């Protein structure tokens, strides 16, 4: 569930088409036929096996139904979904990311799932990410996630630095990075340009916000927010942090697993893939909660961005009745448990976190994901509002301009404030 490219989605095409009357799109093309043969479209091939376990469990109880899981890459997924929405040929079942929920829900594309989702079984964040602007639920919460601190135990041992734990603050992060660099020549904390897996977490730990609670006002220039952004950007000025140019050539993930750096932030959704991809590193790295802000403007200094994905179906699909029944199944404890036991994502259903945690030991992976689960207690909803597709690419470019020295940090923060304010006004 890579998030980096998620923020580059083109939404204007679908928005324009929908406003011309293609609301409540059905499924009349090659994707489905209305004969009990359904297509389930996802964007992550790594989760295909887990989704097939779900469909197999459902089909066992419904032998007349056939559901085919189709996986594509992220960019292709949204290109195809947008095209199918404007040509009345949507897949019967598909994933919906919070980035795009408002666009599809508010234009009548998605079926209302309010009657099949028991909101008490899911976190407020998971439900909010499945809602349209009208407050109705347009998808079944699939999973939930966290941003985690990944660290290399061997490098820490070489430097004589204690492993990160829940007492760590930003000061510990920088002090450990400095000592690691001095003792080993390896990078410490690798602070790459990113919002969800980067500076947003520091903003909310410092008591700041990117948007106000209802998403109607930008908060970049508020002291708690701007100070945290400056802190994060300035981390790159240390010798122990790679430059953004270096990250553009070699990702933090690649640098970490090749032994060049000791720490970076990653998504919980990446951990299973890390384990299966970098098998030679098994037992040499682990995960911890995010360091807290030592002197926040408000709050206790703890926060972590949490997001979620939803299962959805078209409002007027030919197989809508079957699709809705399947969504009811994946909303159940049984359906959510099956997904958790696949190991790729933390189930959205409250109380099933251990089904995901346990898969790591079951597969022989020597890390401790149970360390990160307590962060859900102070998690913060992924930053989003209906105008996000308009402002996000411009904000991202501004961040890159700051790093490149094309604009000062102060001017860049003001620019981000103006960009988001204008986008909200035009929505």
Task: Give each language-model segment a name.
Residues 2, 7-15, 22-103, 109, ...:
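Conserved N-terminal structural module of periplasmic/extracytoplasmic solute-binding proteins
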Residues 60-61, 66, 159, 230, ...:
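Extracytoplasmic/periplasmic substrate-recognition and gating elements
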Residues 71-80, 99, 168-174, 244-258:
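Short helix-initiation/N-cap motifs at beta->coil->alpha
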Residues 85-96, 185-186, 258-266:
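Alpha-to-beta junction loops
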Residues 97-148, 174, 182, 201, ...:
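Hinge/lid segment of periplasmic solute-binding proteins
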Residues 102-109, 127-164, 191-214, 300, ...:
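Periplasmic solute-binding protein
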Residues 128-130, 288, 341-393, 397, ...:
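Long, aromatic- and glycine/proline-rich binding clefts that accommodate carbohydrate-like moieties
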Residues 177-179, 217-245:
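Glycine-centered hinge/linker elements that transmit conformational signals in sensory
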């Amino acid at each position: 569930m890579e998030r980096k490219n998620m923020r580059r989605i083109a939404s204007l095409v679908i928005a324009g088409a929908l406003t011309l009357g293609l609301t409540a799109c059905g499924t009349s093309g090659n994707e489905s036929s209305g004969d009990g043969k359904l297509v389930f479209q996802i964007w992550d091939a790594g989760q295909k096996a887990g989704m097939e376990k779900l469909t197999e469990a459902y089909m066992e109880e419904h032998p007349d139904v056939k559901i085919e899981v189709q996986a594509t890459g992220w960019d292709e997924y949204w290109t195809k979904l947008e095209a199918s929405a404007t040509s009345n040929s949507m897949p019967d079942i598909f994933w919906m990311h919070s980035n795009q929920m408002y666009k599809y829900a508010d234009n009548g594309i998605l079926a209302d799932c309010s009657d099949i989702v028991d909101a008490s079984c899911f976190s407020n964040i998971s439900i909010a990410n499945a809602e349209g602007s009208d407050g109705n639920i347009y998808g079944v919460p699939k999973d939930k996630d966290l941003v985690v601190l990944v660290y290399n135990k061997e490098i820490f041992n070489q430097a004589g630095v204690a492993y990160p734990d829940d007492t760590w603050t930003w000061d510990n992060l920088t002090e450990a990075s400095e000592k690691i660099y001095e003792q080993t020549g390896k990078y410490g904390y690798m602070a790459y340009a990113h919002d969800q897996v980067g500076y947003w977490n520091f903003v909310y730990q410092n008591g700041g916000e990117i948007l106000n609670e209802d998403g109607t006002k930008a908060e970049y220039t508020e002291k708690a927010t701007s100070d945290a952004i400056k802190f994060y950007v300035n981390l790159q000025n240390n010798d122990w942090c790679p430059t953004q140019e270096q990250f553009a050539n070699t990702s933090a993930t690649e640098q970490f697993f090749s032994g060049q750096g000791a720490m970076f932030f990653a998504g919980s959704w990446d951990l299973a893939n890390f384990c299966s991809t970098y098998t030679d590193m098994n037992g040499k790295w682990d995960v911890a909660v995010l360091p807290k802000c030592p002197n926040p403007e408000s709050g206790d200094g703890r926060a972590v961005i949490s997001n979620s994905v939803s299962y959805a179906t078209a409002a007027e699909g030919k197989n809508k009745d079957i699709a809705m029944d399947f969504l009811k199944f994946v909303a159940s404890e049984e359906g959510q448990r099956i997904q958790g036991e696949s190991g790729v994502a933390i189930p959205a259903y409250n109380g099933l976190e251990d089904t995901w945690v346990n898969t790591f030991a079951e597969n022989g992976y020597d890390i401790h994901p149970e360390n990160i689960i307590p962060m859900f207690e102070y998690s913060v909803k992924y930053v989003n509002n209906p105008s996000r597709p308009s402002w996000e690419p411009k904000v991202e470019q501004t961040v890159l301009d700051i790093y490149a020295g094309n604009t000062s940090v102060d001017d860049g923060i003001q620019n981000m404030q103006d960009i988001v304010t204008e986008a909200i006004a035009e929505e």
